[in-house]
């Protein structure tokens, strides 16, 4: 992502969006926008706009954050070892904007690969199916057909 475009987008973020995506913060569980979203659509990086996750792969993990079994395109997420807070975890960042998204854990549904991408709502923007074309994401409509 072009640095000037990224800086412009960063200035438009709310405090929580900035803290989560740029400082690897974490929003509160069960008190965020998408933890219980059941609408069909895709989730894009709040900074770059790149598609990251589909509601088809979202499930209720009971953790209080949106959880997914996989990204739309694995090339759009990068994983890093995270040793903060006295834990060993795998951080998930967006490939294009280097936004902190959340973490991935090996305790997801076994029949869907066994992974749980636990993602902060503040790192995402949701595009409902009926707005995909209008928002420039028409190529992703096929996911829901």
Curated annotation (Swiss-Prot):
Gene Ontology CC entries for this record: cytoplasm
InterPro entries: Met_Sox_Rdtase_MsrB, Met_Sox_Rdtase_MsrB_dom, Mss4-like_sf
Active site: 118 (nucleophile)
Entry annotated with the keyword Oxidoreductase: yes
UniProt entry tagged with the keyword Aminoacyl-tRNA synthetase: no
MsrB domain boundaries: 6-129
Disulfide bonds: none
EC number in record: 1.8.4.12
Family: Belongs to the MsrB Met sulfoxide reductase family.
The protein's name: Peptide methionine sulfoxide reductase MsrB
Protein source organism: Listeria monocytogenes serotype 4a (strain HCC23)
Lineage, opening ranks: Bacteria, Bacillati, Bacillota, Bacilli, Bacillales
Gene this chain is encoded by: msrB
């Amino acid at each position: 992502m072009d640095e000037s475009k990224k800086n412009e987008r960063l200035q438009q973020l709310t405090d929580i969006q900035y803290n989560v995506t740029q400082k690897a913060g974490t929003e509160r569980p069960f008190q965020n926008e998408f933890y219980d979203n059941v609408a069909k659509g895709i989730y894009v990086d709040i900074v770059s706009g790149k598609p990251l996750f589909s509601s088809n792969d979202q499930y209720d993990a009971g953790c209080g954050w949106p959880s997914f079994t996989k990204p739309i395109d694995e090339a759009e997420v990068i994983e890093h070892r995270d040793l903060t807070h006295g834990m060993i975890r795998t951080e998930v960042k967006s490939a294009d904007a280097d936004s902190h998204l959340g973490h991935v854990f090996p305790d997801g549904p076994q029949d869907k690969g066994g992974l749980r991408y636990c993602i902060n709502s503040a790192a995402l923007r949701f595009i409902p199916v009926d707005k995909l074309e209008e928002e420039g994401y028409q190529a992703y409509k096929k996911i829901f057909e």
